[in-house]
Regions:
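Flexible, glycine/small-residue-enriched loop-and-beta-strand segment within the central core
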Residues: 1-11, 16-84, 110-112, 116-129
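Conserved catalytic segment of ABC-fold P-loop ATPases
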Residues: 86-89, 102-104
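Short glycine-rich donor-binding/catalytic loop of glycosyltransferases
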Residues: 94-95, 100-102, 111-112, 118-119
């Protein structure tokens, strides 16, 4: 994991972070409990002016990122400044999240857009592990 400061990051219990996370924590980054962070995810809080003169002054500014509980960020996801991702969301691999994602959403793409809402009834038998039988 690579961080800017390391002081502005809170990670909830049971969260798994894979290889290559970049967390630019100029502002607060909050990651909920029981999240799964895929490889090479970027959490980017810094913001920069578009206008040349203010940008040349190198003033540091940032907007916080909030990730709810039980969120899965697929590999290579980029979360932009000021974004909140609600609880129980799945963000598809390679997505660029530029706006808030409501609780229980499946979002994909660049920019990420919500495809549908998720709940326990969404998942059929192929998503459940069968009970293990003990050999006789």
């Amino acid at each position: 994991m690579r961080v800017d400061y390391g002081d502005n990051i809170a990670v909830g219990e049971g969260t798994f972070v894979n290889y290559g996370l970049v967390a630019l924590d100029v502002a607060q980054i909050s990651i909920g409990a029981h999240c799964q962070i895929g490889p090479n995810v970027q959490l980017l809080t810094p913001v920069h002016p578009l206008e040349p003169t203010p940008r040349a002054c190198s003033l540091e500014a940032a907007d916080p990122i909030t990730i709810g509980d039980n969120v899965w960020l697929g590999g290579g996801v980029i979360v932009c400044p000021g974004v909140t991702i609600g609880d129980n969301c799945v963000i598809g691999a390679g997505s660029v999240v530029t706006k808030d994602i409501p609780t229980g959403s499946l979002a994909v793409g660049n920019p990420a857009r919500v495809l549908r809402q998720l709940d326990d009834s969404t998942f059929g038998p192929r998503h459940q592990h069968p009970p293990q039988e003990t050999p006789q």
